[in-house]
Structures are given as structure tokens and as C-alpha cells.
Amino acid sequence: MTTEKKTMNISEIQELLPHRYPFLLIDRVVDFQEEKYLHAIKNVSVNEPQFTGHFPQLPVFPGVLILEAMAQATGLLAFKSFGAPSENELYYFASVDGAKFRKPVVPGDQLIIEVEFIKERRGIAAFTGVAKVDGDVVCSAELKCARREF
């Protein structure tokens, strides 16, 4: 029995996340299951503004932006799992633990971001995340996001 993958295009992503260029780091969601997992894509282009300074002679996608892409993926999964926050609430990136960077990510790479829901308690949701390029893990971390008023 095959199950149809649930996806999100950029318009659907922008309905859920408040981020916009140049800080929206999820291009497409290729599959997700509420309260389980979400798989997303980030296409890395040399035209992105961070490459003017990181580093001009040898452009490398900053590790903190890989973590931010993972955090945005957890936010999308939280929205789909627990519903959209009210008008005065957001899912905030609350913490990152055990981050490991294994290989550099460069222009032309396609990041596959995979986050998995672990648990939720008092409005704080825990996830594991990995980012891959060509099937190789380039980054892994444990992340938390919190639903809070602003």
C-alpha cells in the first residue's frame, strides 16, 4: 500500500512562516506527517547575500543558517501538528543542542532537511534534525521550538 506524500509549495510555506527574503530558508516541503516528521528542500544559490562575505573566494553556506533552516522546518511541522497560533502568537526557535557540522555546504548544493517530532510539553516541542547533501549528512542537531505570545 502506497501513501501519497503531503507537500507544501512556497505559497503554503509563506502562509505559515513569518520569514521572508533573505531569511526564508525553506523552498519546498516534499513530505510530512503530522506529529511525526517533515522533509524539506533548501536550494543553495551563489546569488544569496551571505556569500558576499562568507567567503568571497570560497563561498560556504553558514552553519548557523543550516540550523535556522532546520528550525524553520520544525516550525512548519509544529503548525501542521498543533495548529496555527493565534494572531499574537508565534513558534519561536527555543534551543539547539548537540549541533554537529560534518561537511561544508556550497552554492549549487541542495539541502534536504529532515526533522522528526520527539515530544511536546507545556508549549515547547522537541525535535531531532539532520541536513543532507547528496545523501550525506552535513549537519545534525536537537532543536526545540516554543509557542509564545508576542
Curated annotation (Swiss-Prot):
Pfam families: FabA. One of its GO terms (cellular component) is membrane. Its EC number is 4.2.1.59. Gene3D superfamilies: Hotdog Thioesterase. The active site is at residue 54. HAMAP family: FabZ (MF_00406). Involved in unsaturated fatty acids biosynthesis. Catalyzes the dehydration of short chain beta-hydroxyacyl-ACPs and long chain saturated and unsaturated beta-hydroxyacyl-ACPs. This is 3-hydroxyacyl-[acyl-carrier-protein] dehydratase FabZ. The gene is fabZ.
